[in-house]
């Protein structure tokens, strides 16, 4: 039996072979990135580099695929690797348990990737990722803000220059223009951010000024849309 038989019917032998031979790096394995990895693995992508320095916490359970009571405290990169190999034992998976940013960018060979997915939260890390991807000539798709939103139908995939509404998109648009970056593909939402109804008591992660509210059905849809775009680009 072929685990990917139904996908093969849709994509054909040529498409499946392209996915099997593809190497995709996913930076950030949270609410969005976890679903990106899941869909890529189930689509038959043959090699995945999974990058995240964080561990699963109890507050991740409401929205993150990798977060279960049984995985709390486990490295997200390791949890993702185990899950991918349970889906496709033949996949080549590298778990990078480290924070990606300007200081660690040189540790990654971007010329070895066929596609890069940015599901990182911080602007400096996102810009460092775009910088290295552009230098290597490797396609990249960046996820912008998915927090403080309730309507997953408002997501769009487009060029950074065509974004609107999203506060993170505004910052990234300005920074990309300043650096002369063109043709940066992003996922963003046209939904106006929803103000939090309560003040968070969680400790702020590094580089974050506040914690957005979140629900399971928004970042998951973003991740699946991104994975779909990556697959379509890879088989073209």
Task: Annotate each language-model stretch with its function.
Residues 20, 108-113, 120-128, 135, ...:
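Glycine-rich phosphate/adenylate-binding loop
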Residues 97-105:
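Conserved SAM/SAH-binding loop
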Residues 1-25:
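N-terminal charged helix/coil linker that caps or initiates catalytic domains
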Residues 45, 50-88:
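Glycine-rich phosphate-binding loop and adjoining beta1-alpha1-beta2 segment
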Residues 41-47, 135:
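Conserved S-adenosyl-L-methionine
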Residues 26-28, 51:
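Conserved N-terminal Rossmann-fold NAD(P)-binding element of oxidoreductases
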Residues 32-33:
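Hydrophobic/small residue at the entry helix of a nucleotide-binding pocket
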């Amino acid at each position: 039996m072929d685990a990917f038989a139904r996908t093969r019917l849709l994509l054909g032998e040529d498409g499946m072979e392209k996915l099997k031979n593809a190497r995709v790096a996913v930076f950030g394995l949270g609410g969005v990135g976890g679903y990106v990895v899941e869909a890529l693995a189930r689509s038959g992508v043959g090699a995945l580099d999974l990058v995240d320095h964080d561990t699963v916490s109890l507050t991740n359970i409401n929205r993150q695929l990798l977060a279960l009571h049984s995985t709390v405290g486990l490295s997200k990169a390791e949890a993702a690797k185990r899950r991918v190999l349970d889906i496709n034992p033949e996949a080549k998976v590298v778990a990078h348990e480290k924070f990606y940013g300007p200081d660690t960018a040189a540790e990654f060979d971007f010329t070895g990737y066929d596609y890069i997915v940015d599901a990182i939260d911080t602007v400096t890390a996102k810009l460092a990722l775009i910088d290295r991807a552009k230098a290597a000539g490797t396609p990249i798709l960046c996820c912008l803000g998915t927090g403080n939103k309730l309507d997953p139908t408002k997501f769009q995939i487009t060029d950074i220059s065509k974004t609107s509404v999203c506060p993170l998109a505004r910052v990234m648009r300005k920074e990309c223009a300043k650096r002369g970056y063109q043709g940066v593909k992003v996922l963003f939402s046209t939904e106006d951010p929803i103000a939090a109804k309560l003040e968070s008591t969680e400790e702020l992660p590094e580089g974050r000024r506040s914690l957005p509210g979140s629900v399971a059905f928004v970042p998951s849809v973003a991740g699946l849309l991104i994975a779909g775009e990556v697959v379509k680009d890879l088989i073209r």
